[in-house]
């Protein structure tokens, strides 16, 4: 996916405000996942997950390729058994020989040490869930954990996690410590409750084990299906890491967001809120739809915040009684004609009241000023007035005259 190195507003804009509107991202360490880097000031990375059975080699290869071709930079694959880990090795090799080397994350959950050790040989990153990596048999009669019991289980976790940490460290590979609000370990629930604090403490326990073994190629996630819980958990995690001198990158996502318009709104509400605070280095929009549907949402969020520019930015008014042409129809025509011109800002405004001012940051403007005619702008400068039925054609001619047109 093409990304302009530094998204900015048009250089044609006069009297630029001295107020800095750039999002200041939290400083994090770079974590290499194959040929992609998460954190360290690199562009926010877009991820997704295939929904094929990993034992279906050809289906999984095709699914990974479909995602990667539309801009998914890292792809996650579920690995619930040793057989799936072996299959993923074959998937990886088949991708290399038939397509290209795509960074893969293995998703490992219940009692996952043996699975994780096997799959770590073949892919770039392993995701583990602290609440499920070491099985704690629930005790319905329990009312609390003593400190000794808490620490005893912590030591078992260390013994189970250490081999994976060491093999990832020695191979230069990465780990995501992926906490889920819905699967906190029982002792965390008893000690901290079903809270963002419990999520943070769960992550910190695993981070400290990794650090004690000199492994810091770590990414952290704090996912929840409720946006307020998710936002609070990530903010608390960022604060605790800052207080402790930790600089691990954060993977953002609202888990189980659903589908359709609301699923997209819910994901955006959580992810964009944190990104606007400067929190977040990689994102996944989780939809109950084909994974390919997630990728455009990710890039739209990043573009809207000015964090990555991978498409044309269109500015258009909502239309009102002053509008002098069919705004929805014209915007569609302009978009279809120019959507391949990555990097441009184009404004389509229905009347003169807000047109020139609202589109001041755009490279080109298409404004209704006189019935039957369109005024075309370059930045704030009106270039010419043309008949309405020639508006889109003349806009293209203006872009071509400026040497900014490329054939689709």
Curated annotation (Swiss-Prot):
Record-linked SUPFAM superfamilies: Dihydropteroate synthetase-like, Nitrite and sulphite reductase 4Fe-4S domain-like
Cofactor(s), by name: [4Fe-4S] cluster
EC number: 1.17.7.1
Major enzyme class: oxidoreductase
GO biological process: isopentenyl diphosphate biosynthetic process, methylerythritol 4-phosphate pathway; terpenoid biosynthetic process
Reactions that this protein is recorded to catalyse: (2E)-4-hydroxy-3-methylbut-2-enyl diphosphate + 2 oxidized [2Fe-2S]-[ferredoxin] + H2O = 2-C-methyl-D-erythritol 2,4-cyclic diphosphate + 2 reduced [2Fe-2S]-[ferredoxin] + H(+)
InterPro entries, sorted: Dihydropteroate_synth-like_sf (IPR011005), IspG_bac (IPR016425), IspG_bac-typ (IPR004588), NO2/SO3_Rdtase_4Fe4S_sf (IPR045854)
Pathway: Isoprenoid biosynthesis; isopentenyl diphosphate biosynthesis via DXP pathway; isopentenyl diphosphate from 1-deoxy-D-xylulose 5-phosphate: step 5/6
Transmembrane segment boundaries: none
Bound cofactor: record note: Binds 1 [4Fe-4S] cluster.
Location of region: Disordered: 1-26
Keywords noted in UniProt: 4Fe-4S, Iron, Iron-sulfur, Isoprene biosynthesis, Metal-binding, Oxidoreductase
Origin superkingdom: Bacteria
Stretches with biased composition (Polar residues): 1-21
Binding site for [4Fe-4S] cluster: 317, 320, 351, 358
Pfam families registered for this protein in UniProt: GcpE
Family: Belongs to the IspG family.
Role played: Converts 2C-methyl-D-erythritol 2,4-cyclodiphosphate (ME-2,4cPP) into 1-hydroxy-2-methyl-2-(E)-butenyl 4-diphosphate.
Protein name: 4-hydroxy-3-methylbut-2-en-1-yl diphosphate synthase (ferredoxin)
Organism: Trichormus variabilis (strain ATCC 29413 / PCC 7937)
Gene symbol of the encoding locus: ispG
């Amino acid at each position: 996916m093409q990304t302009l190195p530094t998204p900015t507003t048009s250089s044609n804009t006069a009297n630029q405000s001295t107020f800095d509107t750039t999002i200041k991202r939290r400083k994090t360490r770079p974590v290499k996942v194959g040929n992609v880097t998460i954190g360290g000031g690199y562009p926010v990375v877009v991820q997704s997950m295939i929904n094929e059975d990993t034992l279906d080699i050809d289906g999984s290869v095709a699914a990974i390729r479909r995602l990667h071709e539309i801009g998914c930079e890292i792809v996650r694959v579920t690995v619930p058994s040793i057989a799936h880990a072996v299959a993923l090795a074959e998937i990886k090799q088949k991708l290399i020989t038939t397509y290209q080397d795509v960074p893969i994350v293995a998703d490992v959950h219940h009692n996952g040490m043996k699975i994780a050790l096997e799959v770590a040989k073949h892919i770039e990153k392993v995701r583990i869930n602290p609440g499920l990596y070491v099985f704690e048999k629930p005790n319905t009669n329990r009312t609390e954990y003593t400190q000794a019991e808490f620490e005893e289980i912590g030591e078992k976790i260390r013994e189970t996690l250490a081999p994976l940490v060491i093999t990832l460290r020695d191979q230069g590979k990465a780990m995501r410590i992926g906490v889920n609000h819905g699967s906190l370990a029982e002792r965390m629930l008893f000690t901290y409750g079903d809270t963002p604090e419990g999520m943070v403490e769960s992550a910190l326990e695993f981070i400290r084990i990794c650090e004690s073994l000199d492994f810091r190629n770590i990414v952290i996630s704090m996912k929840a299906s409720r946006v307020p819980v998710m936002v609070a958990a990530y903010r608390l995690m960022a604060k605790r890491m800052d207080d402790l001198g930790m600089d691990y990158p954060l993977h953002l996502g609202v888990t189980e967001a659903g589908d359709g318009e609301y699923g997209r709104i819910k994901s955006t509400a959580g992810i964009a809120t944190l990104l606007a605070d400067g929190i977040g280095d990689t994102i996944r929009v989780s939809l109950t739809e084909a994974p390919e549907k997630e990728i455009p949402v990710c890039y739209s969020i990043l573009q809207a915040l000015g964090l990555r520019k991978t498409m044309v930015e269109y500015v258009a008014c909502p239309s009102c009684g002053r509008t002098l042409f069919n705004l929805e129809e014209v915007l569609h025509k302009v978009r279809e004609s120019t959507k391949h011109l990555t990097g441009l800002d184009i404004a389509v405004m229905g009347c003169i009241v807000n047109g020139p001012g609202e589109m001041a940051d755009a490279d080109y403007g298409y404004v209704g000023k006189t019935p039957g005619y369109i005024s075309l702008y370059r930045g704030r400068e009106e270039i010419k007035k043309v008949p309405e039925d020639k508006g889109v054609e003349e806009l293209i001619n203006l872009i071509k005259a400026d040497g900014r047109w490329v054939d689709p």
